[in-house]
A protein has these predicted regions:
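Generic structural signal for well-ordered alpha-helices
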Residues: 10-17, 48, 56, 85-92, ...
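Gly/Pro-rich active-site loop or hairpin
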Residues: 36-96
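Hydrophobic faces of well-ordered beta-strands that scaffold small-molecule active sites
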Residues: 26-28, 57-61, 98-103
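Short acidic, Gly/Ser-rich segments with clustered Asp/Glu that frequently serve as metal-coordination loops
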Residues: 22-36
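Active-site acidic/histidine proton-transfer and metal-coordination neighborhood
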Residues: 1-25
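A structural motif corresponding to the C-terminal end of an alpha-helix
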Residues: 19-24, 87-99, 128
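Active-site glycine- and acidic-residue-rich loops that bind
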Residues: 1-10, 32-45, 110-112
Length: 132
């Protein structure tokens, strides 16, 4: 198989779900897609463009870190980065998820840290609602 014949991640999921039970849905990890795209020199939008958006039922977001070499790491240890908020907003222009899941595993100093992420996401969701 040549590189041209290889499926990208979005096309892979499209092919996988094409003939699957229609009740099977996707939990889409915005941060993971963003980190993977940028670490492989792609734009987020191009990287996710072939996903079956109609199958996405849940959007998952978390913060990321940059290591000393500039490589992004999906660590769940920071508040939501501005890039993740922008990418989530882009996704919400194309997807109508039933759920949005925030994951924060480390560096939570207080409930206010978590509430800040919730408020940021709420603003994006309200913006989407006003467009509909």
């Amino acid at each position: 198989m040549s590189n041209n014949d290889q499926l990208n991640e979005g096309r892979f999921f499209s092919e996988l779900l094409k003939d699957a039970n229609p009740r099977i849905k996707i939990l889409f990890d915005v941060t993971n897609a963003y980190v993977t795209a940028l670490n492989n020199n792609h734009s987020f939008e191009k990287y996710v463009s072939e996903y079956p958006f109609e199958k996405i039922e849940c959007i998952h977001v978390s913060g990321f870190e940059r290591d000393g070499k500039g490589t992004l790491r999906d660590t769940h240890s920071n508040s939501l980065n501005e890039e993740i908020l922008i990418s989530t907003e882009w996704m919400l222009q194309r997807v109508n998820p039933k759920y949005i899941l925030i994951e924060r595993d480390f560096n939570v100093r207080s409930i206010d840290d978590v509430l800040e992420d919730i408020y940021k996401l709420r603003g994006i969701v309200h913006k989407k609602k006003s467009i509909l």
